[in-house]
Amino acid sequence: FVMGKIMEDLNFAIEVFKETNRTKELYRVTWWTVQALKSRVGLFEGTYRKYHGLGDYEKYLNDCVSASNEIMTASGGYSLYQSGSQSYRNLFKSENAIDAEIILARDYNNDLSLVHKVQAFENSPTLGRTGVSKKLVNNGIQG
C-alpha cells in the first residue's frame, strides 16, 4: 500500500514537471530527477518483492524499466559522458557537474560555505579509526 502511494506521488510529479520543467538543471529537481527516482524506487521495491516471495513485483520492475527508458531516450535526455580516454576520471574530477550524465548534483562552493568533510576524515591523525597514535603509546612507554 505504501509503495503504491509513493509511485502514485512520483507519477503525479512527473505529470506536473512534464508541463512546466523538462529542462536539464543540475542543481534543481526536474522532470528528469523524478524519473530517476521512480526508476530507483521501482528497482528496489521490485527486486525486494521478487526475492522475498511477495507478489506484484513485475509492476515495480516495469515501472523501473519505463522510467529508465524515458531518461535515456527522451529528447534532450542523458547519455554516458565521453571525453576521450579518461572519460570516467574527467566526469568526477571536473570543477562543475557535467549535465551529459549527471541528473542531480550538489554544488560545493567555499564562498557559500557549502563544503564536505571527506578530506577532514582522511587527513585526521587516526584516519577515521578510534584509538591513540603510535607516537603517544611510545611516549607513554618511555616515561
Where are these regions (language model features)?
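Conserved, well-structured interaction surfaces
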Residues: F1-G4, E8-K24
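An aromatic- and glycine-enriched ligand-binding surface/loop that stacks and positions planar moieties
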Residues: M3, F12, R28-Q35, R40-G143
